[in-house]
Amino acid sequence: MLFFEIIKAIIFGIVEGITEWLPISSTGHLILVEEFIHFNNANAAFTNMFNVVIQLGAILAVVVIYFDRLNPFKSGKTAREVQITWQLWAKVILSALPAAVIGLIFDDWLDAHFQNFFSVALMLILYGIAFIYVERRHQGVEPQVTHLVSLPYKTAFFIGLFQVLSLIPGTSRSGATILGGILLGTSRQVATEFTFFLGIPIMFGASLVKVLKFIVSGTILTGSQLFILLVAMLVAFAVSLYVIRFLTDYVKNHDFTFFGKYRIGLGILLLFYGLMKVLFG
């Protein structure tokens, strides 16, 4: 029944809206959810496309929240403010290039070799440990970059190199870029905010690639599948509006140690579940 499919789409949208922005891997959570919730008559092509395209809802929340800052054509902006906005976009595009190029070349290969329980679990655990280590190492260390406007182009580019690591499922795009930002001397606030903006070209691009591959495969998107996709995107958008604001406030007074511990716990859970599947089917 369509009603139950809508409920499933809502669940996926909630999971995506929460996990896309927190550094805990949306892929890891979606893989776990997919083990228990399946769309009726959904083939692998639709599922693969669905898991990426619902990110559009999440990224639209960033555009809505930060529209004034991201819009260089907003009336009332001074010449300096317009310049700052264009510089921000230049840094975002520069930072997005490495992941865009590597992703286009190796997308299918990465999905084929790393889209599984054990790879995702390993990445969850490794980066969980990394977060805890980096936060302890940086206790009492004053960040060099405390405002996004002063983020150097070189630092933005190197944050983009960290984003390449997130092409391996389970890493977390936000996790990789936030971790990279902290290691490169930015404050948690700057790293988090730049991560939001960096998601715009990357997630729009990734969604476009998946849609094109879906079309090229010759698979037909049914009306009910399109409706389910739109529902999930809308829910992801609504949830993201809250999560983005939550994380922005959270990092003002907290570090990412909790998320590191959470990642380790989830990774162990996925490893155990994956092992049980191998042993008992």
UniProtKB/Swiss-Prot annotation:
<keyword id="KW-0133">Cell shape</keyword>
<dbReference type="GO" id="GO:0009252">
    <property type="term" value="P:peptidoglycan biosynthetic process"/>
</dbReference>
<dbReference type="GO" id="GO:0071555">
    <property type="term" value="P:cell wall organization"/>
</dbReference>
<keyword id="KW-0046">Antibiotic resistance</keyword>
<dbReference type="GO" id="GO:0005886">
    <property type="term" value="C:plasma membrane"/>
</dbReference>
<dbReference type="GO" id="GO:0008360">
    <property type="term" value="P:regulation of cell shape"/>
</dbReference>
<feature type="transmembrane region" description="Helical">
    <location>
        <begin position="45"/>
        <end position="65"/>
    </location>
</feature>
<keyword id="KW-0573">Peptidoglycan synthesis</keyword>
<keyword id="KW-0961">Cell wall biogenesis/degradation</keyword>
<comment type="similarity">
    <text>Belongs to the UppP family.</text>
</comment>
<feature type="transmembrane region" description="Helical">
    <location>
        <begin position="256"/>
        <end position="276"/>
    </location>
</feature>
<keyword id="KW-1133">Transmembrane helix</keyword>
<dbReference type="GO" id="GO:0050380">
    <property type="term" value="F:undecaprenyl-diphosphatase activity"/>
</dbReference>
<dbReference type="GO" id="GO:0046677">
    <property type="term" value="P:response to antibiotic"/>
</dbReference>
<keyword id="KW-0812">Transmembrane</keyword>
<dbReference type="InterPro" id="IPR003824">
    <property type="entry name" value="UppP"/>
</dbReference>
<feature type="transmembrane region" description="Helical">
    <location>
        <begin position="114"/>
        <end position="134"/>
    </location>
</feature>
<dbReference type="Pfam" id="PF02673">
    <property type="entry name" value="BacA"/>
</dbReference>
<keyword id="KW-0472">Membrane</keyword>
<feature type="transmembrane region" description="Helical">
    <location>
        <begin position="196"/>
        <end position="216"/>
    </location>
</feature>
<protein>
    <recommendedName>
        <fullName>Undecaprenyl-diphosphatase</fullName>
        <ecNumber>3.6.1.27</ecNumber>
    </recommendedName>
</protein>
<feature type="transmembrane region" description="Helical">
    <location>
        <begin position="86"/>
        <end position="106"/>
    </location>
</feature>
<keyword id="KW-0378">Hydrolase</keyword>
<feature type="transmembrane region" description="Helical">
    <location>
        <begin position="148"/>
        <end position="168"/>
    </location>
</feature>
<feature type="transmembrane region" description="Helical">
    <location>
        <begin position="224"/>
        <end position="244"/>
    </location>
</feature>
<comment type="function">
    <text>Catalyzes the dephosphorylation of undecaprenyl diphosphate (UPP). Confers resistance to bacitracin.</text>
</comment>
<keyword id="KW-1003">Cell membrane</keyword>
